[in-house]
Swiss-Prot record:
Gene Ontology BP terms: pyrroloquinoline quinone biosynthetic process
Protein name: PqqA binding protein
Family: Belongs to the PqqD family.
NCBIfam families: PQQ_PqqD (TIGR03859)
Quaternary context: Monomer. Interacts with PqqE.
Pathway: Cofactor biosynthesis; pyrroloquinoline quinone biosynthesis
UniProt keyword annotations, A-Z: PQQ biosynthesis
Role, per record: Functions as a PqqA binding protein and presents PqqA to PqqE, in the pyrroloquinoline quinone (PQQ) biosynthetic pathway.
Domain of life: Bacteria
UniProt source species: Xanthomonas euvesicatoria pv. vesicatoria (strain 85-10) (Xanthomonas campestris pv. vesicatoria)
Entry's Gene Ontology molecular function annotations: quinone binding
Length: 92
């Protein structure tokens, strides 16, 4: 993992934006010269990357919203965040 913890407060890097792609009818992260398609779960997490909320806070919000296990959601949020960070789409 690349130093991501439950206390990390990620945001989209400059030049990366969350956008609905009408041609694909799918939400994507649009970055210079590439597009990353998001599934429904990745979308609800990515919508919360604002640079102010920690991953623990995001996980707690999602656990409450979806009535799910907070520990499992936190692990999944950290894993997704690590993947997107490795693709250079996020800053911490």
């Amino acid at each position: 993992m690349s130093g991501i913890t439950r206390h990390s407060q990620p945001s989209l890097r400059a030049g990366v934006r969350l956008q609905h792609d009408r041609a694909r009818d799918q939400w994507v992260l649009l970055a210079p010269e590439r597009v990353v398609e998001l599934d429904d779960i990745a979308l609800v997490v990515a919508q919360r990357y604002d640079g102010t909320r920690s991953l623990a806070q995001i996980a707690q919000e999602l656990a409450a919203e979806f009535d799910a296990d907070a520990a499992q959601i936190e692990a999944d949020v950290i894993e997704l965040t690590d993947t997107l960070h490795q693709k250079r789409l996020l800053r911490l």
